[in-house]
Amino acid sequence: MSDHPNNYPKLHNAAWPGLVGKGDGGEPPIDLDTMLDLTAAAEVDGVKFDGFDIFLYHPHFNIDGGDEETKRLAEKARARNLQVGTVVVPGYPGTGGGLPMGGKADQEKFLGQVHKTCHVARKLRELGVRPHGVVRIDSVCSVEAWSEDPKGNQKRIADTFREACKIAEDHGERLAAEGEICWGGMHSWRRMVELLEMVDCRETLGFQADMSHTLLFLMGYNAPEDALLPQDFDWNDHERFDEAYAKLTTALRPWTIDFHVAQNDGTVYGSGSHDKTGRHCLATDPKGKLDIPHHAGFWLRDESGRLTKAFRHLCWDGCMFPNATLRKRDTWNDILGAMVGVRDAHGWKG
């Protein structure tokens, strides 16, 4: 442990790789107990995961299960000496939610799921297992559908998110929107900033930065007009890459209140019911375009190099891997090792 003196930010795993891209004709989901056991078993130089983030949806969680369901989740965490961090709203159509840019019925479904999730989040705090973390939301619409009326749809999403902020404030929570190339209105760095500014609830709504998804922002995959790198970019030109990455993070870092350590090989991928989005790679993938500790620093430090300390935990995100890979202990040790490297470089003692 003396080689890794920093204890903040706390290091979390994500439980949802056992769900995202699973089912719907693909591989079956991996149950929550298995994901938590794998998380608790990982260890690097005496360092272990401190907690996990979770998507509050079947089969990992029943959002309509009442406080008893929340108590069961708290018990699962406590039994493994893990904390709960950020919780993800099941706001998608098909998970009980609706489109934020849709009509009144859709918006009410979405906001209803936000309310349920914020209640669970607050209860987990009261139960003593969730000292940090936010509530994550998405626009949950395709870029194609959003593009039919960009101005009108962006306004409706902003209006719905503003109402979601009121719900979060009533529960003592903050919301974070995760920009991904597959979510309309949040599919480029410029549109993401635009949406956050339109909502104009900076104290309550922020950005969740995922290192994999934001890499695709640089490439302008679904928004070529917002690309910061050309299509024929030479990935060996590290200086030019870092210049573009600095521009990206300068725009989004002031909004960032939640962070995903991740790797990407510069391509997109989708499986199961999940649309194509930035391909998550394993932490040790030789095709990965990111120097994880180096590029994490663009998010965790300001332009002068000072730590922002804008969030108290980091979460790994790596989805749509084969179940056989997810069940290997070495997978999680490698991931934890990458996260320890980030904390060694950009963490602090607290």
Tell where the protein language model's regions lie, with residue ranges:
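A short helix->loop->beta-strand "cap" motif at the edges of active sites that frequently abuts
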Residues: 82, 130-131, 173, 305-312
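Histidine-acidic metal/acid-base catalytic patches
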Residues: 1-44, 126, 158-159, 186-350
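N-terminal pre-domain/capping segments
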Residues: 1-131, 162, 169, 243, ...
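Surface-exposed cleft-lining segments at the edges of enzyme active sites
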Residues: 102-105, 142-152, 177-184, 226-237, ...
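Glycine/Thr-rich phosphate-binding loops of Rossmann-like dinucleotide-binding domains
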Residues: 62, 145, 269
